[in-house]
Protein backbone atom coordinates (compact mmCIF):
# COMPACT_ATOMS: atom_id res chain seq x y z
CA UNK A 1 0.00 0.00 0.00
CA UNK A 2 0.99 3.62 -0.49
CA UNK A 3 2.67 5.10 2.62
CA UNK A 4 -0.20 7.60 2.72
CA UNK A 5 -2.12 4.90 4.56
CA UNK A 6 -1.28 4.66 8.26
CA UNK A 7 -4.36 2.91 9.70
CA UNK A 8 -5.83 -0.50 8.93
CA UNK A 9 -8.63 -2.82 10.02
CA UNK A 10 -9.57 -6.20 8.55
CA UNK A 11 -13.27 -6.56 7.69
CA UNK A 12 -13.46 -10.27 6.98
CA UNK A 13 -10.65 -10.12 4.45
CA UNK A 14 -11.43 -6.61 3.14
CA UNK A 15 -8.84 -4.05 4.33
CA UNK A 16 -10.31 -0.81 5.68
CA UNK A 17 -7.59 1.82 5.46
CA UNK A 18 -6.97 5.52 6.05
CA UNK A 19 -4.33 8.16 6.64
CA UNK A 20 -3.20 9.35 10.05
CA UNK A 21 -5.84 12.10 9.77
CA UNK A 22 -8.74 9.65 9.87
CA UNK A 23 -10.07 9.29 13.43
CA UNK A 24 -10.20 5.76 14.75
CA UNK A 25 -13.96 6.11 15.23
CA UNK A 26 -14.47 6.65 11.48
CA UNK A 27 -12.29 3.68 10.56
CA UNK A 28 -14.15 1.46 13.01
CA UNK A 29 -17.50 2.63 11.65
CA UNK A 30 -16.46 1.80 8.08
CA UNK A 31 -15.30 -1.62 9.31
CA UNK A 32 -18.66 -2.21 10.97
CA UNK A 33 -20.65 -1.29 7.85
CA UNK A 34 -18.51 -3.37 5.48
CA UNK A 35 -18.63 -6.38 7.82
CA UNK A 36 -22.40 -5.94 8.14
CA UNK A 37 -22.99 -5.78 4.38
CA UNK A 38 -20.89 -8.88 3.73
CA UNK A 39 -22.71 -11.10 6.24
CA UNK A 40 -25.20 -12.51 3.76
CA UNK A 41 -23.04 -12.59 0.64
CA UNK A 42 -22.52 -16.00 -0.98
CA UNK A 43 -19.10 -17.50 -0.28
CA UNK A 44 -18.02 -17.31 -3.93
CA UNK A 45 -18.81 -13.59 -4.08
CA UNK A 46 -16.86 -12.93 -0.89
CA UNK A 47 -13.96 -15.00 -2.18
CA UNK A 48 -13.90 -13.09 -5.46
CA UNK A 49 -13.83 -9.74 -3.64
CA UNK A 50 -11.07 -10.80 -1.26
CA UNK A 51 -9.04 -12.51 -3.97
CA UNK A 52 -9.17 -9.40 -6.17
CA UNK A 53 -7.75 -7.29 -3.35
CA UNK A 54 -10.81 -5.11 -2.84
CA UNK A 55 -10.25 -2.51 -0.12
CA UNK A 56 -12.08 0.40 1.46
CA UNK A 57 -10.40 3.78 1.93
CA UNK A 58 -11.72 6.34 4.39
CA UNK A 59 -11.21 10.04 3.66
CA UNK A 60 -10.74 12.32 6.65
CA UNK A 61 -13.03 15.33 6.94
CA UNK A 62 -10.45 17.68 5.40
CA UNK A 63 -9.14 15.26 2.79
CA UNK A 64 -10.49 15.20 -0.75
CA UNK A 65 -11.00 12.46 -3.30
CA UNK A 66 -7.70 13.26 -5.01
CA UNK A 67 -5.80 12.98 -1.72
CA UNK A 68 -6.42 9.23 -2.00
CA UNK A 69 -3.31 8.01 -3.87
CA UNK A 70 -5.26 5.71 -6.20
CA UNK A 71 -7.57 8.61 -7.15
CA UNK A 72 -4.91 11.29 -7.53
CA UNK A 73 -5.08 10.92 -11.31
CA UNK A 74 -8.53 12.53 -11.20
CA UNK A 75 -6.81 15.89 -10.60
CA UNK A 76 -6.11 15.98 -14.34
CA UNK A 77 -9.81 15.71 -15.23
CA UNK A 78 -10.54 19.23 -16.45
CA UNK A 79 -14.24 18.48 -16.95
CA UNK A 80 -14.98 17.97 -13.26
CA UNK A 81 -13.61 18.88 -9.84
CA UNK A 82 -13.68 15.50 -8.14
CA UNK A 83 -12.86 16.98 -4.75
CA UNK A 84 -16.13 18.91 -4.95
CA UNK A 85 -18.15 16.24 -6.77
CA UNK A 86 -17.49 13.13 -4.71
CA UNK A 87 -17.16 12.11 -1.06
CA UNK A 88 -16.96 8.47 -2.02
CA UNK A 89 -16.43 6.33 -5.10
CA UNK A 90 -17.20 2.71 -5.89
CA UNK A 91 -14.64 0.16 -7.00
CA UNK A 92 -14.37 -2.07 -10.05
CA UNK A 93 -11.96 -4.67 -11.43
CA UNK A 94 -9.65 -1.97 -12.81
CA UNK A 95 -9.41 -0.26 -9.43
CA UNK A 96 -10.86 -2.40 -6.62
CA UNK A 97 -11.12 0.44 -4.12
CA UNK A 98 -14.23 1.86 -2.47
CA UNK A 99 -13.93 5.22 -0.73
CA UNK A 100 -16.10 7.00 1.82
CA UNK A 101 -15.78 9.99 4.12
CA UNK A 102 -15.48 10.61 7.85
CA UNK A 103 -18.32 13.13 8.01
CA UNK A 104 -20.83 10.77 6.40
CA UNK A 105 -19.72 7.75 8.40
CA UNK A 106 -20.14 9.64 11.68
CA UNK A 107 -23.14 11.81 10.70
CA UNK A 108 -21.57 15.21 11.20
CA UNK A 109 -23.90 18.17 10.72
CA UNK A 110 -21.76 19.45 7.85
CA UNK A 111 -22.21 16.23 5.85
CA UNK A 112 -23.76 17.17 2.50
CA UNK A 113 -25.25 13.67 2.22
CA UNK A 114 -26.71 13.82 5.72
CA UNK A 115 -29.82 11.75 4.97
CA UNK A 116 -28.12 8.69 3.46
CA UNK A 117 -25.20 6.32 3.96
CA UNK A 118 -22.71 6.78 1.13
CA UNK A 119 -20.48 3.84 2.07
CA UNK A 120 -23.43 1.47 1.67
CA UNK A 121 -24.02 2.90 -1.82
CA UNK A 122 -20.38 2.84 -2.93
CA UNK A 123 -19.61 -0.58 -1.45
CA UNK A 124 -22.71 -1.87 -3.25
CA UNK A 125 -21.00 -0.88 -6.52
CA UNK A 126 -17.94 -2.89 -5.50
CA UNK A 127 -20.01 -5.93 -4.55
CA UNK A 128 -21.59 -5.74 -8.01
CA UNK A 129 -18.54 -4.99 -10.15
CA UNK A 130 -15.83 -6.84 -8.20
CA UNK A 131 -17.76 -9.59 -6.43
CA UNK A 132 -20.71 -10.64 -8.60
CA UNK A 133 -20.23 -9.68 -12.26
CA UNK A 134 -16.81 -11.37 -12.80
CA UNK A 135 -18.14 -14.76 -11.66
CA UNK A 136 -21.69 -14.36 -12.99
CA UNK A 137 -21.49 -13.14 -16.61
CA UNK A 138 -25.28 -13.10 -16.95
CA UNK A 139 -25.85 -10.88 -13.94
CA UNK A 140 -25.86 -7.60 -15.87
CA UNK A 141 -28.34 -9.07 -18.35
CA UNK A 142 -30.62 -9.81 -15.41
CA UNK A 143 -30.24 -6.26 -14.14
CA UNK A 144 -30.89 -4.87 -17.63
CA UNK A 145 -34.11 -6.86 -17.81
CA UNK A 146 -35.32 -5.58 -14.43
CA UNK A 147 -34.26 -2.05 -15.34
CA UNK A 148 -36.19 -2.14 -18.62
CA UNK A 149 -39.32 -3.33 -16.84
CA UNK A 150 -39.35 -0.50 -14.29
CA UNK A 151 -38.83 2.00 -17.10
CA UNK A 152 -41.81 0.52 -18.94
CA UNK A 153 -43.84 0.78 -15.73
CA UNK A 154 -42.92 4.43 -15.29
CA UNK A 155 -41.14 3.85 -11.99
CA UNK A 156 -38.16 5.75 -10.55
CA UNK A 157 -38.93 8.73 -12.80
CA UNK A 158 -36.59 11.67 -12.16
CA UNK A 159 -34.33 9.77 -9.73
CA UNK A 160 -30.66 8.75 -9.65
CA UNK A 161 -31.68 5.08 -9.77
CA UNK A 162 -32.80 5.60 -13.37
CA UNK A 163 -29.28 6.64 -14.49
CA UNK A 164 -28.27 3.10 -15.46
CA UNK A 165 -28.24 -0.45 -14.10
CA UNK A 166 -25.31 0.35 -11.81
CA UNK A 167 -27.08 3.13 -9.95
CA UNK A 168 -30.33 1.14 -10.03
CA UNK A 169 -28.52 -1.62 -8.12
CA UNK A 170 -26.66 0.66 -5.68
CA UNK A 171 -29.74 2.72 -4.82
CA UNK A 172 -31.62 -0.54 -4.36
CA UNK A 173 -29.01 -1.76 -1.89
CA UNK A 174 -29.36 1.49 0.07
CA UNK A 175 -33.11 0.93 0.23
CA UNK A 176 -32.56 -2.68 1.29
CA UNK A 177 -30.54 -1.50 4.28
CA UNK A 178 -32.94 1.38 5.07
CA UNK A 179 -30.25 4.06 4.62
CA UNK A 180 -31.43 6.06 1.62
CA UNK A 181 -32.79 9.59 1.52
CA UNK A 182 -36.41 10.33 0.65
CA UNK A 183 -38.31 13.32 -0.66
CA UNK A 184 -42.00 13.95 -1.15
CA UNK A 185 -41.63 14.50 -4.90
CA UNK A 186 -38.86 13.13 -7.15
CA UNK A 187 -36.03 15.67 -7.34
CA UNK A 188 -33.59 14.10 -9.78
CA UNK A 189 -31.93 12.06 -7.05
CA UNK A 190 -34.55 10.53 -4.79
CA UNK A 191 -38.25 9.85 -4.50
CA UNK A 192 -40.45 8.57 -1.65
CA UNK A 193 -38.77 5.14 -1.67
CA UNK A 194 -36.16 4.59 1.05
CA UNK A 195 -36.85 1.36 2.95
CA UNK A 196 -36.72 -2.38 2.31
CA UNK A 197 -40.42 -2.73 3.03
CA UNK A 198 -41.26 -0.07 0.45
CA UNK A 199 -38.85 -1.66 -2.04
CA UNK A 200 -40.61 -5.01 -1.70
CA UNK A 201 -43.91 -3.34 -2.61
CA UNK A 202 -42.62 -0.90 -5.23
CA UNK A 203 -40.07 -3.08 -7.05
CA UNK A 204 -40.51 -6.72 -5.99
CA UNK A 205 -38.27 -8.02 -8.78
CA UNK A 206 -35.26 -6.03 -7.56
CA UNK A 207 -36.16 -6.94 -3.98
CA UNK A 208 -36.02 -10.64 -4.87
CA UNK A 209 -32.65 -10.24 -6.58
CA UNK A 210 -31.17 -8.40 -3.61
CA UNK A 211 -32.50 -11.07 -1.25
CA UNK A 212 -30.08 -13.53 -2.85
CA UNK A 213 -27.12 -11.46 -1.65
CA UNK A 214 -28.14 -9.64 1.51
CA UNK A 215 -29.76 -10.56 4.81
CA UNK A 216 -33.12 -8.95 5.77
CA UNK A 217 -31.60 -7.35 8.85
CA UNK A 218 -33.62 -4.92 10.94
CA UNK A 219 -30.81 -3.09 12.72
CA UNK A 220 -27.90 -1.42 10.98
CA UNK A 221 -24.61 -0.07 12.35
CA UNK A 222 -25.12 3.04 10.21
CA UNK A 223 -25.71 6.27 12.11
CA UNK A 224 -28.15 7.28 9.37
CA UNK A 225 -31.39 6.34 11.08
CA UNK A 226 -34.35 5.38 8.96
CA UNK A 227 -36.75 8.28 8.56
CA UNK A 228 -39.80 7.24 6.62
CA UNK A 229 -42.18 10.16 6.11
CA UNK A 230 -43.39 9.31 2.60
CA UNK A 231 -44.44 6.19 0.72
CA UNK A 232 -44.16 5.70 -3.04
CA UNK A 233 -47.20 4.96 -5.19
CA UNK A 234 -47.29 1.28 -6.07
CA UNK A 235 -48.26 1.90 -9.68
Tell what function each PLM region has:
Residues 173-235:
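Pan-zinc metallopeptidase signature
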Residues 101-106, 146-155, 188-190:
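Short, conserved helix/loop micro-motifs enriched in His/Cys and acidic residues
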Residues 18-21, 155-163, 193-199:
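Active-site rim elements
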Residues 130-182:
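Post-HExxH zinc-binding segment in Zn-dependent metallohydrolases
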Residues 8-10, 48-52, 161-169:
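Extracellular/periplasmic catalytic domains that process cell-envelope and extracellular macromolecules
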Amino acid sequence: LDPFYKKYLDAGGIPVIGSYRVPDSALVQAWRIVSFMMEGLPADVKGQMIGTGLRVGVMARYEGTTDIPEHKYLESDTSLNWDVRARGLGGDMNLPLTTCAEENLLCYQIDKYHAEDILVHEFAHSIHLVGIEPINPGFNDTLESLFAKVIDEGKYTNTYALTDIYEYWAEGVQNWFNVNAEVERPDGKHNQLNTRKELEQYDPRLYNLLSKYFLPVEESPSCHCMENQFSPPLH
